[in-house]
Amino acid sequence: MRRPFIAGNWKLHKTSAEAAALVGELKGALSDVVDRDIVVAPVFTSLAAVIATLEKSDISVAAQNCYPENQGAFTGEVSPALLKDAGCRYVIVGHSERRQLFAESDAFINRKVKAVIDAGLSAILCIGETLEEREADKTFDVLERQVRCGLEGLDAAAMEQIVVAYEPVWAIGTGKTATDSQAQQAHSFIRSLVNDIFGSKVAQQVRIVYGGSVKPGNVDGLLQQPDIDGALVGGASLNAEDFIRIVKFKAV
């Protein structure tokens, strides 16, 4: 049985004080939730405040990005080693906004994945198709390319440090959500790819989560699907009440 994984990606929101207040509320409300992994991903400038507030809590912290070198003349960048030193456990890699706004390639994303794993952190590898790609029936082609490129060079042991997040680009920040069956179909395909690359044991162990306008009103249906192991939550994670409800999803 795969342990559910719920992560909140705050993107470019929340001052340090606001971030600390939010996780303080989450820490109290979710202290009794012990059967799933809970993660928050604040902006870099709020990491210290969030990590300090979450001391003695089971809620983990992720960074939203990294650079795939540990040190050097890379002005403005942050390495996985420094993120680990700060107290992070996860790094989001390959988010569609990084791919689209900053032209990050599959090969560059693969470098990040390897760097995160080498630093002893876990990577949340984001993949997903655009609306144009879905309408052109290229969804599976895109997912296969992103999975194979993103995981290239990894072995079965490294896959223990990977969470795959399927985020259909057309459903991010648009209010649109993939139907339960659309999401399950994509997740099942992704798991079949992992099976093809690493074998059935890894495929059955790897967690594949859904991201794309996850809200309290749709999380229960999504998390009832057999291959959906959690959620990467965007806007709804900025509201304590909404995120708490999502973490406490009622899948049956």
UniProtKB/Swiss-Prot annotation:
GO process terms (BP): gluconeogenesis; glyceraldehyde-3-phosphate biosynthetic process; glycerol catabolic process; glycolytic process
Keyword S-adenosyl-L-methionine tagged: no
Top-rank EC class of the record's enzyme: isomerase
Transmembrane segments: none
Catalytic activity: D-glyceraldehyde 3-phosphate = dihydroxyacetone phosphate
EC number of the protein: 5.3.1.1
Subcellular location(s) per record: Cytoplasm
Principal localisation: cytoplasm
One CC-aspect GO term: cytosol
Any Pfam family the entry gives: TIM
The entry's keywords: Cytoplasm, Gluconeogenesis, Glycolysis, Isomerase
GO MF terms held by the record: triose-phosphate isomerase activity
Active site: 95, 167
Amino-acid positions noted as binding substrate in the UniProt annotation, renumbered to this chain: 9-11, 173, 213, 234-235
SUPFAM superfamilies per record: Triosephosphate isomerase (TIM) (SSF51351)
Pathway linked to the protein: Carbohydrate biosynthesis; gluconeogenesis; Carbohydrate degradation; glycolysis; D-glyceraldehyde 3-phosphate from glycerone phosphate: step 1/1
Functional summary from the UniProt entry: Involved in the gluconeogenesis. Catalyzes stereospecifically the conversion of dihydroxyacetone phosphate (DHAP) to D-glyceraldehyde-3-phosphate (G3P).
Family, as annotated: Belongs to the triosephosphate isomerase family.
Assembly behavior: Homodimer.
Stated name of the protein: Triosephosphate isomerase
Species annotation: Syntrophotalea carbinolica (strain DSM 2380 / NBRC 103641 / GraBd1)
